[in-house]
Swiss-Prot record:
A motif (Twin CX3C motif) lies at residues 40-66. It comes from Saccharomyces cerevisiae (strain ATCC 204508 / S288c) (Baker's yeast). The lineage of its organism: Eukaryota, Fungi, Dikarya, Ascomycota, Saccharomycotina. SUPFAM superfamilies: Tim10-like. It is a peripheral membrane protein. One of its GO terms (biological process) is protein insertion into mitochondrial inner membrane. Belongs to the small Tim family. The twin CX3C motif contains 4 conserved Cys residues that form 2 disulfide bonds in the mitochondrial intermembrane space. However, during the transit of TIM12 from cytoplasm into mitochondrion, the Cys residues probably coordinate zinc, thereby preventing folding and allowing its transfer across mitochondrial outer membrane. It is found in: Mitochondrion inner membrane; Mitochondrion intermembrane space. This is Mitochondrial import inner membrane translocase subunit TIM12.
Length: 109
């Protein structure tokens, strides 16, 4: 976000295309974060009654390991996808219709 608010580049305008890309990146990051949160919560925190207000040492270690593994695998898969040149515009024929619909929906707001 500092890219958009950087005072050193005050004369530079931000294009709508860059804002759209930033929005897609934010949505992807938010989705990844929520996926990590729900997966690690399900795996590491017991569902029965909570005896303590804080996490136990075992729960903390479990969450740390879980988040590290999820982050590592996400980076590994992302790197693989980038090296293979996979992109929605190449492999997903309906992507351009999706992007056009998203932009149209956003402009109505």
């Amino acid at each position: 976000m500092s890219f958009f608010l950087n005072s050193l580049r005050g004369n530079q305008e931000v294009s709508q295309e860059k804002l759209d890309v930033a929005g897609v990146q934010f949505d992807a990051m938010c989705s990844t974060f929520n996926n990590i949160l729900s997966t690690c919560l399900e795996k590491c925190i017991p569902h029965e009654g909570f005896g303590e207000p804080d996490l136990t040492k075992g729960e903390q270690c479990c969450i740390d390991r879980c988040v590290a593994k999820m982050h590592y695998s996400n980076r590994l898969i992302g790197g693989f996808v980038q090296t293979r040149g996979f992109g929605p515009e190449n492999q997903l024929r309906h992507y351009s219709r999706f992007v056009a619909k998203e932009i149209a929906d956003d402009s109505k707001k």
